[in-house]
Amino acid sequence: MYSPESMNSNISSPSPPSSSSLNAPSLADAPEVRSDDGEAETSEPSTSVTAVPMEIVSQASTSAPVNQLLASGIDMSSVIKNNAVLQALLASASAGGFGDNAGLTMSKLLTAALANGSTAVAKRDAGSPRTDIPKKTRLKVFSNGFFMTFDKLSSCQKKYFWRCEYKNTCKARMHTDIVTEKILTFIHEHNHSAPIDEEVRLYGLDPTNIERNRVYIVGNVADPNQRRKIRKQVADREAAAKRLVQQQEEEQQKQQSASSIVAARAAYAQAMQNGSIPTSSGVASFLQSTSATAPMTSHSMLLAQMPFLNNIKTEMSNMVKNEQFTPERYTQHMSPNLPLQTATIAPLIIPTENYDSPSYRQPAIKRKATDLTNEEHDLRRDPMFQPTFELARKLRKLWKGEPNRYPRTTTTPTHHFEFFLSKNDGTDEHLYVPMRINLRDEAHLKEALQDFCGQQCIGMLLFGISPKISVMFNQPMLNNWDNNQFFLLDISNPSRWRLMYVDDQAV
């Protein structure tokens, strides 16, 4: 029987060929050699062995691979037929191309054929039919109007995870219970339209008898080409409907614009015939009556046809802001009716008024004083000036020096301590108030700070060196500080107040 161990022992390298001729053995004790037909040849025994003829070695080396090939069941004719190298070697061996080493060469060839025989036989002929391996497919189900494919089993081994059949573009997911087969969770919504009834019928389902929140196993029995055709037809119909709606909207917009232009021109022509320019209320009522079926949509086009409406609108808005708008006053100061001077004048008549006349003098416009302290009128937040202030703030940060963390000290301190104080409200600018304490100690300083804030400090009073570093007040610290310096008081934490120094020379 064939085994890897027997093959390795039988194909060991044989002894080198001797220079003697290939005659019958003449040794006294020649070994027994079994040929292919099963007969045993025995020579006379001898006391010494000097050499082994090549014929005996070749027969012994060749018989083992042959027996292994026969036992393995490999069709040698197919191996030789499908291997051009073996055919060439056999032709060379039959012609005597190997010389005295023909047995050794054939043994190696048979051993190689035994090692690669299964591969050679497994090769498909050019004329033989192709046997394709079935493609691995996923289970498909239909639920709530969409097709889902199996994704994986949950880690708890209690749920099935399903994903949309268009997994590359749609994130919809579904979880079902393994035992009850009920839908547990829906994750995300489908970003595409649901399949039509024709697609559902391809999978053997009746769209009229499908229950909601139920999973129907459909498999992959539908014709993919047929479904692609259906999907393409649906996509073409949706695209055509979308184009039709867009064309209808464009046509409707054109009609509305045209009707607005016609109405504006009619109003302007009527005003020119009457010899006066109508008021804004008259124009609006006329336009509303002439274009009731097609409302105006383009205000810029209307103002282009009737420029005086823009001036009327601006004048009315200014008067409303100044709280001076009344119907009587507005009609009193309207432009007077001017007759047409000549027939060659341009269609658009701009009325002229005599501003020197007292009857035509416009009322003085009263404006409210702008409160610069009001946050609503802060110029720093104005869109026009904000970039300038931002640039100035950045330049100021670049030009100013590094601020000091500690107040300036003096060698001749006074008994009293004068300083400027402000609350830290988080803004960039602060209003400082002058303060004075008669004695330089923590008690008097704390009392002055409480009077300034109107609150009681229930905790400690600290001196802030940085946003994260604070130290407690001590007497030598207060004794060496110079007068007329600036400080910020932070009372956001009632348990500890922080007094921080502001370097006025670096600001």
Curated annotation (Swiss-Prot):
Regions that span the bilayer: none
Biological processes, Gene Ontology terms: negative regulation of DNA-templated transcription; nematode larval development
Region (Disordered): 1-51
Residues in the signal sequence: none
MF terms (GO), sorted A to Z: DNA-binding transcription factor activity; sequence-specific DNA binding; zinc ion binding
Zinc finger (FLYWCH-type): 135-192
Superkingdom classification of source: Eukaryota
InterPro entries, per database record: FLYWCH-type_ZF, Znf_FLYWCH
UniProt entry keywords in alphabetical sequence: Developmental protein, Metal-binding, Zinc, Zinc-finger
One Pfam family matching this protein: FLYWCH
Cystine connections: none
Phenotypic consequence of gene deletion: Knockout, in a flh-2 mutant background, causes poor coordination, egg-laying defects and dumpy appearance. Causes a ninefold to 10-fold decrease in lin-14 level in embryos and about 2-fold increase in the levels of micro-RNAs lin-4 and mir-241. Despite the increase in lin-4 expression, post-embryonic heterochronic defects are not observed. RNAi-mediated knockdown causes precocious embryonic expression of micro-RNA lin-4, exacerbated by simultaneous RNAi-mediated knockdown of flh-2.
Compositionally biased intervals (Low complexity): 1-26
Described purpose of this protein according to its UniProt entry: Probable transcription factor. Binds to the DNA sequence motif 5'-[AG]GGCGCCG-3' in the promoters of target genes, including micro-RNA genes, in order to repress expression, and acting redundantly with flh-2.
PANTHER family xrefs: FLYWCH TRANSCRIPTION FACTOR 1, FLYWCH ZINC FINGER TRANSCRIPTION FACTOR HOMOLOG
Name of this chain's protein: FLYWCH transcription factor 1
Top-level taxonomy: Eukaryota, Metazoa, Ecdysozoa, Nematoda, Chromadorea
Gene label: flh-1
